[in-house]
A protein has these predicted regions:
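Structural recognition of an alpha-helix C-terminal capping motif at a helix-to-coil junction
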Residues: 71-78, 82, 93-105, 190
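Arg/Lys-rich amphipathic alpha helix in sigma70-family domain 2
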Residues: 82-90, 100-121, 142
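Conserved catalytic/ATP-binding subdomain
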Residues: 67, 93-97, 143, 147
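Conserved RNAP core-binding helix
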Residues: 28-30, 45-48, 56, 66-83
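Intrinsic, short, N-terminal disordered tails of RNA polymerase sigma-factor systems
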Residues: 1-38, 42, 46-49, 111-115, ...
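Hydrophobic recognition helices of helix-based DNA-binding modules
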Residues: 55, 59, 80, 84, ...
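Sigma70-family region 2
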Residues: 37-38, 61-65, 77-92, 113-115
Length: 209
């Protein structure tokens, strides 16, 4: 009997913010990192392609628009390449955690220029779709879900929004989120446990006709 993996609903919703790039093993990542350190531009590009979606998913809730999130992602990778010579792999530590720490810091620098995170919520008021054979129905649902996710996240305190975004948008483990944010791992776990059901309930509420 085939067992299908159950996708966490928050992971599925965050996936709407950016499409995944190629999947790399950690060994492959380390080979690319070492090659990029030596100036191999194709290795640097492979790292970018593999991780840009996760960076975008992690920083989009921290930014006021998709354009700002894209700028933050680009600046993140400029910093990654500039500081790559300082990166030292440690057993059990993942390269993506280092990248997303830089992304989080970059997003917070950008946010210092404005203290409110407005979210375009027009898409939340789209007309109800017909359940007929409209080929755009699924796309419309995705637009509404994406907008609902961003609205729900924007209502969280900055600390909790950052933790949730790194955890489910960036795919980091609790200890990696703790290292990226300077919070204790137990506090990160408590934030995730508390906010996850709240977010899902709020998103469901926003999607009600």
């Amino acid at each position: 009997m085939t067992h299908l993996a159950v996708i966490d609903p928050l992971v599925r919703l965050f996936a709407l913010l950016a499409s995944d790039g190629p999947t790399l093993t950690e060994d492959a990542v380390q080979r690319l990192v070492e090659a990029a350190k030596e100036g191999d531009s194709s290795a640097a590009r492979e790292l970018y392609d593999a991780y840009v979606a996760r960076v975008l998913r992690a920083v989009r809730p921290l930014c006021r628009s998709e354009a700002e999130a894209e700028d933050v992602a680009q600046e993140t990778f400029v910093t990654v390449l500039t500081k790559l010579h300082t990166y030292q792999h440690r057993p059990g530590a993942r390269f993506i955690a280092w990248v997303l720490t830089i992304a989080r810091n970059t997003a917070h620098r950008s946010a210092r220029h404005r203290r409110v995170v407005p979210v375009d919520t027009d898409t939340l008021h789209l007309p109800d779709r017909d359940d007929g054979a409209d080929p755009t129905a699924a796309a419309l649902d995705h637009v509404r879900e994406k907008a609902a996710l961003l609205q729900a996240l924007s209502e969280l305190p900055e600390r909790d929004r950052t933790v949730v975004s790194l955890r489910w948008g960036g795919g980091l483990k609790a200890r990696e989120v703790a290292r990226a944010t300077g919070l204790k791992p137990d506090l990160v776990r408590k934030i995730c446990q508390r906010r996850r059901p709240q977010l899902l309930a709020r998103i469901e509420e926003l999607l009600q006709p």
